[in-house]
Design a protein with these regions (language model features):
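Short, solvent-exposed alpha-helical surface patches in non-cytosolic proteins
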Residues: 3-7, 62, 125
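Hydrolase catalytic cores
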Residues: 1-51
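Charged/polar, solvent-exposed surface patches and flexible loops
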Residues: 29, 33, 62, 90
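Extracytoplasmic soluble-region selector
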Residues: 68-146
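Secreted peptidase-domain scaffold signal
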Residues: 60-69
Length: 146
C-alpha cells in the first residue's frame, strides 16, 4: 500500500504541471505528515498496543494534498521597519498546528496567526525561518532584512 501511494504521489507531483525537483526527503516529509493515528483503536484487549503501532495508517488523499503543496516557500526581502505577510495556507494543507524556529531571532519580528506569518524587519542581515506543520514537513524561508 505505501509503495503504491508513493508511486501515485510522485506521478501526481510530476503530472499535468510538469514540475521538477521532488526529492526523497520531500516525499518522506509528505508521507510522515499524511497519517492518521490508530491509537484510538487500541482499547479493550488491544490496549497493550497503545503507543506501539508506529506513526499510524497512511491517508493517501492527505498525501496527495500534501504533495501538491510540498514545494518550498519563496525567499523574502523586507526593509527595516517594514512588514511582509506570507499566507502559509498556500504552502501547507493545515495551518492550525504550524510552528517555527529562527536561526537569528533578533533580525526579524515574527507573528503567526490564522495561517498568516507576518515578518517585520528589525535590523539588517539574513536569517532562516523553518516552518513546521507539527508532523514531518519543515520548510525554510530565507529572509533578508535590508
Amino acid at each position: 500500500h505505501v509503495s503504491g501511494a508513493c508511486a501515485l504521489a510522485v506521478s501526481y507531483y510530476y503530472g499535468a504541471e510538469k514540475r521538477k525537483g521532488l526529492t526523497g526527503e520531500m516525499l518522506r516529509q509528505a508521507l510522515l505528515s499524511s497519517t492518521q493515528s490508530v491509537d484510538r483503536y487500541c482499547t479493550g484487549k488491544y490496549q497493550q498496543y497503545l503507543g506501539n503501532m508506529g506513526i499510524g495508517s497512511l491517508d493517501t488523499y492527505k498525501l496527495l494534498r500534501n504533495i501538491a503543496k510540498i514545494d518550498g516557500i519563496p525567499a523574502q526581502r523586507v526593509g527595516v521597519g517594514d512588514t511582509v505577510s506570507i499566507d502559509l495556507s498556500n504552502h501547507f494543507t493545515a495551518t492550525n498546528v504550524l510552528g517555527y524556529t529562527v536561526s537569528v531571532p533578533d533580525l526579524v519580528k515574527i507573528e503567526l496567526r490564522g495561517g498568516v506569518m507576518k515578518l517585520t524587519g528589525l535590523k539588517k542581515g539574513r536569517t532562516t525561518i523553518i516552518v513546521s506543520d507539527g508532523a514531518a514537513i519543515r520548510k525554510p524561508i530565507e529572509v533578508t532584512v535590508e
